[in-house]
Amino acid sequence: MHSFLYNYGTYYDASASAWQAYDGVSQDIGMNEGFLGCYSVLKNLSCMTAAEKTDHDTFLMMSNSTTHEIQLLQTPDYTPKYYVDNTTYDLLHSDRFTYNGVTAHITAPYQMKHYHINMGALLRMGEWFDYMRENGVYDNTRIIIAADHGAPELCSFDDMIADFSAGGIKDVLDYNPLFLVKDFNSRGFKTDMTFMTNADTPVLAMKGLISEPVNPFTGKPVNSDAKQGEQPLILSELWDIEQNDGNTFAPSRWYSVHDNIFDLGNWKELDFH
C-alpha cells in the first residue's frame, strides 16, 4: 500500500503538476508544469497562426521558455509523457552525442534533460516551419532564433572548460546561447564562427530592409561596430535581479573574449570589480 500511494514521490498528483521523479538518465515519472505550458505553445503554433496574402510586410516576435524548464522527454519524438522510459532507445543510439569526431558528455540527468528539452523545442519549431512551407510563407520569411544564455555549468565538452587562475574552472559555453538565422530563400545549413552577440539580432533582422536603421529610443545607429576587438564580459553568479538590483552590476569577476569563442586562447581573465 505504501509503494502504491507513494508512486515514486508523486503521490498520484495530477500528471501536469507532479514534478518528475527521475531514475538515472533514461527514466522519469511525472511532468514539469512550467515546461508543459511553454512546450504546448510550440506544439500548437500551426493552429495559432495563419498565412494570408497582403500588400505589406509583416513582423512577428515571440518569446518562449520551453528550454528554461528541464525534464526528460519520450524518444524518439522527444514529447512529454507521464511515464518516460528511454532505456532501449538510449542503448541503441548511444553514439548520437558524437558528431564530426566531437563528443558531448551526456551522462548525468541534468545534462540529459537539457539535451531533451532542446531537441523537443527544435523539433516542434521544425514542424511549424514545415507548416510555413506548405502555406508558401517560408521562403519569403527571415527567421531568427536567439536564446538568452547557455546552460549553466553543463560541462559537456572538455575543450570548453577553462581553468582561470583566479576565477577557477568555468564552462565558457554558459555564454554561448543558440543563435540561428534563416534568410530569405536560403537553402542548406552553414556554421559561421564569426563573433556574434545577441545585439546582432536587430542588425540582421533589418539588414537589406531598412537603410541606415536608427534606434528610436536612443537615436543611435543600429549596427555591430561595438563588438570589434576584445569584448569585456562579467561572469557573475548573481543573476537574480532581486539580489543584483542596483544601478551598476554587483562586484564580480570580469573576463574578455574576441573572435572565435570556441578557442580558449581567445579568453582572458581581467579582474574583480
Short names for language-model regions:
Residues 36-49, 53, 84-142:
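A long, amphipathic alpha-helix that forms part
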Residues 67-69, 105, 149, 161-167:
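Histidine-centered active-site/metal-ligand motif
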Residues 1-98, 207-209, 218-224:
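Active-site-proximal alpha/beta segments of enzymes that process anionic O-linked groups
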Residues 71-75, 153-158:
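A short acidic (Asp/Glu
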Residues 59-66, 115-118, 142-147, 181, ...:
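Short beta-strand segments
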Residues 62, 104-108, 112, 120-123, ...:
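Proline/Glycine/Serine-rich low-complexity intrinsically disordered segments
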Residues 16, 20, 28-36, 47-53, ...:
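Membrane-interface soluble catalytic domains
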Residues 172-176:
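Short, solvent-exposed loop/turn segments at the edges of secondary structure
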